[in-house]
Amino acid sequence: MSIVNKPAAVKAGTGKGLTIERIYTTAGVHPYDTVKWERRDVVQTNWKSGEVIFEQKGVEYPEFWSVNASTIVTTKYFRGALGAENREWSLKQVIDRVVLTYTKAGKEHGYFATPADAEIFEHELTHMLMHQIFSYNSPVWFNVGTNAPQQVSACFILSVDDTMESILNWYKEEGF
């Protein structure tokens, strides 16, 4: 099997890409400006001993986000070592890391009919993520927007041929 590098389906800027319709957002208004943001401390403790096992103070979330949701995102998806200067501290940074990476790739590969369509795509995704209408799977949050190429799917599928040898090898590889 060989992998062929194909050029983008549509040359960027030709106007032949996707036209995106606004559903949740308003032209000229960034989604972040439509909600009230607050700073909060995220603290996790050992349920038996009460010992603090994680703490990041002053993280930023929309005020309507639950403590549980902000704890999960802060402890699992913020990039950077805890206490390091480059550690993410706001949901805006996490959303931007992913959404801006996908929007940039879409622009580079001609997925959008116009620059306005790219902005609508960015704003709609930002709104939906901020309002928890949908979420990406963990590998996207862990890896998109990082310097090294990473896997962004939640599972790795091994191909299997329609032969007994291939099927048995699949079992061996999968650890059954």
Which residues fall in each region the model found?
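Extended catalytic cores of very large enzyme megasubunits
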Residues: 1-176
